[in-house]
């Protein structure tokens, strides 16, 4: 019985490590696909955070939050000015996180 218990724990650890690796790979792909194109440092920071929240720190991330972070990744890569990055962030927030949606 002890062997089966340890075998189960080991299998769970191996499975969780594989999932974490997939998330890390998706995070890296996200950074390469979006943040690496940024010309504005604040937009790059917002996109890096969005990638992190979607693929690394996504425990209990709501669908509204997922949609918000994806909105940032969809619209921030071409931003060249901080003021526009802030406008995109506010618009994504209003569209996806508003209490009225």
Named regions from a protein language model:
Residues 1-7:
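Bacterial N-terminal signal peptides that target proteins for export
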Residues 12-101:
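Mitochondrial intermembrane space
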């Amino acid at each position: 019985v002890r062997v089966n218990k340890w075998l189960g724990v080991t299998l769970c650890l191996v499975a969780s490590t594989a999932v974490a690796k997939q998330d890390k790979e998706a995070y890296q792909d996200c950074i390469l696909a979006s943040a690496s194109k940024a010309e504005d440092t604040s937009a790059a920071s917002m996109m890096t955070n969005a990638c992190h929240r979607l693929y690394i720190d996504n425990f209990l991330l709501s669908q509204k939050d997922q949609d918000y972070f994806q909105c940032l990744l969809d619209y921030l890569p071409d931003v060249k000015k901080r003021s526009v990055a802030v406008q995109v962030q506010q618009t994504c927030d209003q569209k996806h996180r508003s209490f009225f949606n």
